[in-house]
Amino acid sequence: MQITNKIHFRNIRGDIFGGLTAAVIALPMALAFGVASGAGAEAGLWGAVLVGFFAALFGGTPTLISEPTGPMTVVMTAVIAHFTASAATPEEGLAIAFTVVMMAGVFQIIFGSLKLGKYVTMMPYTVISGFMSGIGIILVILQLAPFLGQASPGGGVIGTLQNLPTLLSNIQPGETALALGTVAIIWFMPEKFKKVIPPQLVALVLGTVIAFFVFPPEVSDLRRIGEIRAGFPELVRPSFSPVEFQRMILDAAVLGMLGCIDALLTSVVADSLTRTEHNSNKELIGQGLGNLFSGLFGGIAGAGATMGTVVNIQSGGRTALSGLVRAFVLLVVILGAASLTATIPLAVLAGIAFKVGVDIIDWSFLKRAHEISPKGALIMYGVILLTVLVDLIVAVGVGVFVANVLTIERMSNLQSEKVQTVSDADDNIRLTTTEKRWLDEGQGRVLLFQLSGPMIFGVAKAIAREHNAMGDCDALVFDIGEVPHMGVTASLALENAIEEALDKERQVYIVGAAGQTRRRLEKLKLFKRVPPDKCLMSREEALKNAVLGIYPHLADGVTAPSSEMG
């Protein structure tokens, strides 16, 4: 397997332009997410460079742009807030938080190495929509304090909501005006201009220039980013807290899993735009390496970013070279122009992050979820509430569990209709003319027990119900020829029906056992109780043998009609 991503120079012009355009979009977003996370603008920039570089170089989606994203920032905010509060010093807490980022990267590398990529996006859409919308709401709520010109209160979402009256009573008009103006520019900028220059960059530059002249740094106490240190970052030594180690593992797992989902969903978008197919397992390894190195050098966690990826593709990017160009451009900005960011108002960055939060919310599905599926809508709303008020991992776990239970119930109900007991040819089941003849000759003493389709554990109840409803008989023909897969629970229910029939000294025939179904029954040792001459591949032959076993005199002079379907 090729170690690096797909890189060639046949599309060098498109890749360079795509990378440059993606870098222009990434700059304001990285600054905003760095500040929003609590780690600072510098951490956001280095996260954009390092995650973007290593994910592009070693990932499995050639056009994917990786950087700090809204969902990852929400989790990072909680991680940083917790460990800076619980550690002996804020610096130690920040080191632990960056260690969690490294651990999240290791988790992603493990997920990719175990080839779990294909399972990540098999989550029900109601759950994905719910937790993404919940993350969007969290990001919006967390920006309320800086949006209103004040420092964020502790306690995350709950703390912000509890302090909302205080925040509103101490509103800073100048900073709030800058934040509102930022949102207005991004929201209402004409589409024809958006295609030329990203509205986030326009809002960042205009907001900074206006603030510089209206609120001069020398005389105003307007909150700004402050100077970002030029040069390469220092290595962050991994720091572990024995008391908090369990919390570190859990946070790293959540961050890693969210990064996997975020990246692979964006990879699917990239596939649809480029008509290619990504390598999900390779992508997870690339994302993991990106987050590992980002944490190692004091950057926040990142994942595949939909906006940057789409812009990269639309600008001509087709290989991983575009992602590498983007990372190089951002590196040049950090090393050569870091001082220019010192006067950027925090309110402008809050406005950018606020708009990202609004965009993350799945408005399209929220508006029509109740029309598509009331149960699905309830799952989505439940996941949103749990994400916002409890915990992301709890929200996803509960959402997936409930969605799967409902799906299993629907599948079981559909498959239960394919569990039938037939006593005569008048029953609603397709039989050949010969099979109908033999079933009629059985005079109700021979029953055909037919199963078809995959038999999951939810069908066990239907098998037991049909078996219990059987009338008195002398022979049972179990037809499983149309069962491609049989789960453990369903096979045990079938075993129980066969064992009970044998205990009552009834003749038992098994028809059509093949493939996985046969192997399952062999493991249950059923074929030791049902002799080979009664394990047949032909339903007609099984019915004939069952009838003749009860009425041997019918063997004399019996003529078998043709076998066309009735």
Swiss-Prot record:
Coiled coil start-end: none
Binding site for Na(+): 262, 266, 304, 306
GO terms under biological process: bicarbonate transport; sodium ion transport
Gene3D superfamilies: STAS domain
Periplasmic topological domain residue ranges: 37-42, 86-93, 148-169, 218-247, 340, 393
Keywords per UniProt: Cell inner membrane, Cell membrane, Ion transport, Membrane, Metal-binding, Sodium, Sodium transport, Transmembrane, Transmembrane helix, Transport
One CC-aspect GO term: plasma membrane
Ranges in the topological domain labelled Cytoplasmic: 1-15, 64, 115-126, 191-196, 269-318, 362-371, 415-566
Topology of the protein relative to the lipid bilayer: Multi-pass membrane protein
Pfam families reported for this sequence: STAS, Sulfate_transp
Domain (STAS) ranges: 436-546
Binding-site list for hydrogencarbonate: 69, 305
Electron transport found in the keyword field: no
Induction behaviour: Induced by CO(2).
InterPro entries the UniProt entry points to: SLC26A/SulP_dom (IPR011547), SLC26A/SulP_fam (IPR001902), STAS_dom (IPR002645), STAS_dom_sf (IPR036513)
Gene Ontology terms, MF aspect: bicarbonate transmembrane transporter activity; metal ion binding
Compartmental location: Cell inner membrane
Residues annotated as transmembrane: 16-36, 43-63, 65-85, 94-114, 127-147, 170-190, 197-217, 248-268, 319-339, 341-361, 372-392, 394-414
Function: Low/medium affinity, Na(+)-dependent bicarbonate transporter.
Family stated for the protein in its record: Belongs to the SLC26A/SulP transporter (TC 2.A.53) family.
Record's protein name: Bicarbonate transporter BicA
Source organism: Picosynechococcus sp. (strain ATCC 27264 / PCC 7002 / PR-6) (Agmenellum quadruplicatum)
Gene: bicA
